[in-house]
């Protein structure tokens, strides 16, 4: 008890000493600032006097001899970039008087734990030492180093073992399941977090309003898709089978979530998807119906079911761009450039969602200032849900989806998007002009003039 009391007293003394030295450094910095202001003011006065003397001499027809102004620092302030001595003669770098977490000085904040942290920063710092999944302290290894994994977007730190111990991961937002929460397993063994489940599109009927919205969005960019074709939500197995029959193999490096088909196929479409029951239990009674999709350049679009509306819409916009290219005779484009353009359209739709509004004037203003345009394109379709009505998670989810596109470094989708984006920048974000560059770079010629 006595030892603990003595330790607390020592900490208080240390805190007071750090505060005193921090205030001293702040005072020195303020004196330096004032001295520099005084010097600048002196320069301005000297310049004004010289100009006045020149003007007077000129008026009198005399030759004015300028004088060199020699300035010297009187008692120059000590530098706060190097080390300073504190009361007991110890040499301390001012950076040591900053918070270990936010790196701001302690002058305007309370401090804790021997001057290392602001109180709020201390809580944040030590909160991040706990695993996001198991809520336990992230362990140190044999070398005494605390190693952790962290999602690049969500910034949630967790024990590396959870990547391998069967912890559920949401197939939409990629977050691991924290202990004490219940992720939902879909019929094709994918996991979905409760937040993503809240706006998930579960069957073919549910996706049709989004289908019409995406078509209006393309028409607003002068990329109207005239042909009618099927849009079906399917399970993962049906999507993989259709991909094989389309003889597409470049998706294998990534998870396939959508497909624009050109071959006649019989596809099991989900006409009644799963529903949430009592106590957040998923009722997985899925009803499917075999549908024949046939036609010419485009026979239909398949999208995996159970993803949130924002992610489903982005995938649909991507596949709709594939459909537009095929229907308008753009063949034999370089794979990475075609996929990059489709990613760009998916990004454009996501961006339009962040500005969704029921105010037509506001929507028009957004469209006119948008980074993607098609000469004098009218405003894109106005969505049924204003972004102001979104939950905090939905606002983060749309940022996550856009970040996934921009930060992707895969050879086809990621690098393709970056190449196309550079073309768009050089064409002032005009899609049609960018498409001409893509055709030229692919040594391809469209079958029709668009």
UniProtKB/Swiss-Prot annotation:
Keywords: Coiled coil. Residues 1-46 form a coiled coil. The keyword Coiled coil applies. Residues 27-87 are annotated as: Disordered. InterPro entries: DA1-like, DA1-like_dom. Residues 27-47, 56-69 have a biased composition (Basic and acidic residues). It holds the Pfam family DA1-like. The keyword Cell wall biogenesis/degradation does not apply. PANTHER family: PROTEIN DA1-RELATED 2, PROTEIN DA1-RELATED 3. This is Protein DA1-related 3. It comes from Arabidopsis thaliana (Mouse-ear cress). The gene is DAR3.
